Amino acid sequence: RETQIELALEKVRSRTMAMQHSDELQEASFLLDQQVRALGIKTWGCAFNIYGENESTEWFGNEAGVLHTYTVPREGIFKEYYQKGQNGESLVIQEFSGEACVAHYEYMSTLPVIGDVLKILKKTNNGFPTFQIDHVVYFKYGYLLFITRESVPEAHQVFIRFAKVFEQTYTRFLDLQKAEQQAREVQIELALEKVRSRSMAMHTTTELQ
């Protein structure tokens, strides 16, 4: 079992280590869900939630595929998850059942991108689900969300391990982005300096040609 978990973690680690752009988190979310299910943990879907200043960006994937990147406001349940993370929680288990679950889906269906998918789900399933469990696992830049339709206490530590792996690789990704940005700024400065030097060396207006 431990070997299987390590292999699943390594697949997610390798994929996120190879990221060149944050949009690739779409594919990574699908892989994350795939690897968790391969361990026998029945998930309905997995998401990466990365904090912004006043809202978060999410990438969601499940067995059916991935969604385009979407943002979620810092209100309602999202505000609650954010605040619990800021208060030092490492894992939050949130159950939705009955009318509360339907109300949660009704709210989610008002959001861009994911809302369109949920409206289709409502039609094809003759209504929204009446039970689900959110497993929110925090890391430095946000949290991972694992959605299940049943209690999976044996998976909690596995979820936490996935979050730790993702924090390491996402930190590396941010470092690479920062280094690339600095390199671009240096190139721009060099180009500007060449133009500046040439302009300073001009003696007549004909040299503008």
Predicted segments, located by residue:
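Helix-to-coil/beta transition segments that act as allosteric "coupling" elements at the rims
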Residues: H104-Y143, S151
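GAF sensory/regulatory domain recognition
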Residues: A47-T110
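Helix-loop-beta substructure at the N-terminus of cytosolic sensory domains
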Residues: A18-H68, A201-Q209
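A cross-kingdom feature marking solvent-exposed beta-strand/loop segments within repeated
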Residues: F30-Q34, F128-Q132, L145-F146, E150-Q157
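Signal-transmission linkers at sensory-effector interfaces
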Residues: R1-M19, L25-E27, R172-L208
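Surface-exposed receptor/substrate recognition regions of extracellular proteins
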Residues: E53, G61, G65, T124-N125, ...
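Intrinsically disordered or highly flexible coil/loop and linker segments, enriched in small
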Residues: A38-G45, L91, Q168, R172-A179, ...
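Amphipathic alpha-helical "output/dimerization" segments
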Residues: S151-R172, Q181
